[in-house]
Amino acid sequence: NNAFTIQLLGADNQQQLKNHLNVIRKYVEITDIFVYRTLAKQKPSMTVLYGSFADRRAAQEALKQLPTVLKANKPIVRTAQGIRAEIAQHQSPQ
């Protein structure tokens, strides 16, 4: 399964994430939002994703339909496979 999603933004800390989520939830269903931890420039970060789409075209269309305020952080279309690989790459061994 290689679904697509929209990466809305990354947040460096919990307060920043909370502030962003409070804005995002005004425009899209919170149940369509996913957050995961990763590294950005070798620092811990939380990435916010929106939606799950069957193909790239559907995700790109949804991205075009986002309100301007949600486009402020330059969202991009990503594959679920790419996100899983990123998470696996940045997981620390137990």
Give a label for each model feature.
Residues A3-L9:
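Active-site-flanking beta-strand signature of metal-NTP-handling nucleotidyl enzymes
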